[in-house]
Amino acid sequence: IQSTSMDQGILTEDSMNSFIRTLIQAGIWKNKVPKQTARTKDGMQTTVKKTEAEADAMASKDTRLGFQPVVSVDAELLRQQRRFSSPRVLLSENTPLEPPPLYLTEEPMVLNRTSRRKREGKSHRGEYSVCDSESRWVTDKSSAVDIRGHQVTVLGEIRMGSS
């Protein structure tokens, strides 16, 4: 399982408890369903399954004593427990077809971008800002200088469609 973002959400205590209960119910916790031996009135021994509360108490006792349970988890069970807070996270069992986008290297000829880069961090390839030195929209200009220093014409209106 691979993640393409470091923006994974933190699991809450309730979701972790739910996950552990699922493991216990599936018989995966310690690779068996916990059982205990009980005596009936006639002295015969019977095997009785522990309740969920008793299993949780035993697990917490084992943790306090330093025992780490061996857990083998099926991939399908983990697939059901994915909980991330960001839609930008993509999990896949396959390797990505291409590497992640590269960061632009610092270019010495780029003007007026030093303070902006410090504020916003490095920009990704193909991501350009419309206006670097002003923090408001400019609507009355017919020409401008782009980030590479070239003179460009600013379109007052963009027509879309077949007109």
UniProtKB/Swiss-Prot annotation:
Glycan attachment points: N112
Q: What ranges does the record give for the region Disordered, renumbered to this chain?
A: 114-133
Query: Which GO biological process categories is it annotated with?
Result: cell surface receptor protein tyrosine kinase signaling pathway; modulation of chemical synaptic transmission; negative regulation of neuron apoptotic process; nerve development; nerve growth factor signaling pathway; neuron projection morphogenesis
Its annotated compartments are: Secreted
Q: Which family does it belong to?
A: Belongs to the NGF-beta family.
What does the UniProt function comment say about this protein?
A: Seems to promote the survival of visceral and proprioceptive sensory neurons.
Name the record gives this protein:
Neurotrophin-3
Q: Which organism is it from?
A: Lichanura trivirgata
